[in-house]
């Protein structure tokens, strides 16, 4: 059990590490958002293909799942042009959970009163964070982009729930998303031109793709069968907090009282909504 707990902590550090790495790269102007996304997907695809075997990788995954993955990765990178690491991770996490809970409702799940209270609390927390006019409000464009990134990741996760081999499916989806990103890069560069990335930016993007994404997702799928659903959900609640602490240490970002209150409201609300058993519609 200690071994599983240690691996789970390592995976959560990897997930939070994606926020820190992209923010570190973009805040120092050593790489553009599109370049970071391209390298991240290519590096992730390469590592996952080596783990899953190249031939099987090309035959796995789906183009629709890959499109959702592309939406997540692209909007994630562009959102972090204007968001702190902790704030971005919190918005992403909240968006993912809200979409997934909404999907459950659409497919017949019924929420208990405590779950509705949790959803309300999480939404109030987001409103408190994003409400216009406050001095410490995050950039609205960045927040919207991160919300779209969360939508992409939620749809990707929902499609991958019943994959027979999650690692193989992820490898195939990363490979297909790499094809997509090359295709959209030319029109995007016309609209949002970027300078050539520096060596530092390239290295950070490779680490994000190969290690915190590729290896991180692989480890997560290895750990999941050994974790009860409640423990898996609780573990993921730690990611925004870890990202905020990492942003404070590595990026000199300020963790404000407002962010602390918002994080408590959102994570507490999501915990209430996801850890309490739902009912199926009769």
What does each of the following model-derived ranges do?
Residues 3-10, 34-50, 118-121, 141, ...:
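Hydrophobic alpha-helical transmembrane segments of multi-pass integral membrane proteins
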Residues 37, 41, 237-282:
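C-terminal-most transmembrane helix of multi-pass membrane proteins
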Residues 47-55, 78, 95-120, 127, ...:
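C-terminal transmembrane-helix exit sites in multi-pass transporters
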Residues 88-95, 160-180, 210-249:
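Helix-helix packing/entry segments at the starts of transmembrane helices
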